[in-house]
């Protein structure tokens, strides 16, 4: 056995990154460069553990491991002790402490953190998508969207896009304005992916008047007039009928409620939701 060079064996039933980072943090506290780290990820069988231990036995070694599967964790501890190999269980003390605080038991499934990371990045991607393709900014996004929302101004298109993005849905939205022809890409999107948003004209007048007030403008602007609102609603209704998409009245609904209806529509159609729900 070489007493000078330390070999740190990293064993994990996942990728082993946690154990390696802890080992590196610990070894940095010592004034030495005479060490080597060997990482062995995805250890799921006892015979793999046996192979690592036989190698470690020949050297001045320490085993640092993260095993959430209790059977494998116990096996490493027992076999390492028999062979007089130093071993450190990184995960179990943390699981034990958290289990006591939460009064529940851990799942003990390898790789869960990777799944959480993947879900997080899907959400970030969906949020970035919603921002990029909000308010008809770039019609090229319509073909890539999971959901396309259409409606006149102040029908909750943007809040709904962001809410659904937090459910990992890529959402684009297109404003419908009588003076502006909808992009041709809108008619190329399958109608099953499009949701129309409408509202009560009285409610919309109130919302738009509040909007004008916030901007320091007078309520007399045509934007908040009944005549203009009815014109917009009629125009939007014609577009939605042409598309053949379902229409949701958002006038009395919170964003969460409207989003729930949209997701239910897609589930009923058999769409595989990105967040698996």
Swiss-Prot record:
Signal peptide residues on this chain, from the entry's feature table: none
A molecular-function term among this protein's GO annotations: phosphotransferase activity, phosphate group as acceptor
Superkingdom: Bacteria
Database matches in InterPro entries: Kinase-pyrophosphorylase, PPDK_reg
EC number assigned by the record: 2.7.11.32, 2.7.4.27
Presence of keyword Kinase: yes
Protein keywords: Kinase, Nucleotide-binding, Serine/threonine-protein kinase, Transferase
Enzyme class label: transferase
Amino acids binding ADP: 151-158
Keyword Transferase: yes
Catalytic activity, as annotated: N(tele)-phospho-L-histidyl/L-threonyl-[pyruvate, phosphate dikinase] + ADP = N(tele)-phospho-L-histidyl/O-phospho-L-threonyl-[pyruvate, phosphate dikinase] + AMP + H(+); N(tele)-phospho-L-histidyl/O-phospho-L-threonyl-[pyruvate, phosphate dikinase] + phosphate + H(+) = N(tele)-phospho-L-histidyl/L-threonyl-[pyruvate, phosphate dikinase] + diphosphate
Family, per entry: Belongs to the pyruvate, phosphate/water dikinase regulatory protein family. PDRP subfamily.
NCBIfam families, A to Z: PRK05339.1
Function, in words: Bifunctional serine/threonine kinase and phosphorylase involved in the regulation of the pyruvate, phosphate dikinase (PPDK) by catalyzing its phosphorylation/dephosphorylation.
Name under which the protein is recorded: Putative pyruvate, phosphate dikinase regulatory protein
Source organism: Alkaliphilus metalliredigens (strain QYMF)
């Amino acid at each position: 056995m070489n007493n000078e060079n330390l070999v740190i064996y990293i064993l994990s039933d996942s990728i082993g990154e946690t154990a390696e980072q802890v080992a590196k943090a610990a070894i940095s506290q010592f004034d030495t460069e005479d060490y080597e780290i060997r990482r062995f990820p995805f250890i799921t069988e006892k015979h793999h553990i046996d192979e690592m231990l036989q190698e470690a036995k020949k050297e001045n070694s320490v085993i640092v491991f993260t095993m959430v599967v209790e059977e494998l964790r116990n096996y490493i501890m027992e076999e390492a002790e028999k062979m007089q190999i130093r071993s450190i269980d990184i995960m179990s003390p943390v699981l034990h402490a958290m289990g006591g605080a939460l009064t529940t038991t851990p799942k003990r499934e390898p790789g869960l953190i990777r799944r959480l990371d993947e879900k997080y990045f899907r959400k970030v991607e969906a949020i970035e998508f919603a921002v990029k393709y909000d308010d008809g900014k770039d019609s090229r996004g319509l073909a890539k969207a999971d959901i396309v929302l259409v409606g006149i101004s102040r029908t909750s298109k943007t809040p709904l896009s962001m809410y659904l993005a937090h459910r990992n849905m890529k959402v684009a939205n297109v404003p419908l304005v009588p003076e502006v022809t909808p992009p041709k890409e809108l008619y190329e999107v399958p109608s099953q992916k499009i949701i129309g948003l409408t509202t009560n004209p009285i409610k919309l007048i109130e919302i738009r008047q509040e909007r004008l007030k916030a901007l320091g403008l007078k309520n007399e602007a045509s934007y908040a007039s009944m005549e203009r609102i009815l014109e917009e609603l009629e125009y939007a209704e014609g577009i939605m009928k042409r598309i053949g998409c379902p229409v949701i009245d958002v006038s009395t609904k919170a964003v969460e409620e409207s989003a729930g209806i949209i997701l239910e529509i897609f589930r009923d159609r058999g769409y595989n939701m990105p967040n698996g729900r």
